[in-house]
C-alpha cells in the first residue's frame, strides 16, 4: 500500500462548514504542524480518538480559521490508517488555504476514490462495498 499521507476536501462546495480529511502514516503529525489547540498545553497527538479538539489553523503566526479537528487512530478509521478531519468554515478560500498548508507540510492531494481504495486494501471494506461507494460518488 502507498505510504503517502493524503488530503482532500470531503464536503460539497457552498456549505457553511467544510471538512478536509487527512489520512496516512504522518496524518496526525502534519495536521499538528498547522493546528494549535485553543487549550494551552494541549497537543493533538495526545487527544483521545473520536473526540473533537477546538483550535486554530495557522500559517506561521497568522490565524487562518477557527476549527474543530477529530482524530482517528489506525486501525480504527475509514482507511485503517491514522487520520484527522478538519472541520472549518466552508468558504472556498479557507478550504483551499488549509489544503495548501497541508500539502506544504508533506501531504499530497488524494486521487479520486483513493480513500476508498485504501479502505479496501486495508481490509476495512469488501469489493461490493467499495463498488457501492464508487457508484454513489458517480451518481452525484
Describe the function of each predicted region.
Residues 1-140:
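A glycine-rich (often HGG/GG-containing) alpha/beta subdomain
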Amino acid at each position: 500500500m502507498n505510504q503517502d499521507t493524503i488530503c482532500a476536501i470531503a464536503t460539497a462546495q457552498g456549505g457553511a462548514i467544510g471538512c478536509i480529511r487527512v489520512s496516512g502514516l504522518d496524518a496526525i503529525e502534519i495536521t499538528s504542524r498547522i493546528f494549535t489547540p485553543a487549550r494551552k498545553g494541549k497537543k493533538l497527538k495526545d487527544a483521545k480518538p473520536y473526540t473533537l479538539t477546538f483550535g486554530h489553523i495557522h500559517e506561521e503566526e497568522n490565524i487562518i480559521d477557527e476549527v474543530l479537528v477529530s482524530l482517528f487512530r489506525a486501525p480504527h478509521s475509514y482507511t485503517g490508517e491514522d487520520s484527522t478531519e478538519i472541520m472549518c468554515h466552508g468558504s472556498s478560500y479557507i478550504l483551499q488555504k488549509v489544503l495548501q498548508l497541508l500539502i506544504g507540510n508533506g501531504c499530497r492531494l488524494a486521487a479520486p476514490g483513493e480513500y476508498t481504495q485504501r479502505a479496501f486494501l486495508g481490509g476495512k471494506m469488501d469489493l461490493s462495498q467499495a463498488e457501492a461507494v464508487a457508484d454513489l460518488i458517480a451518481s452525484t
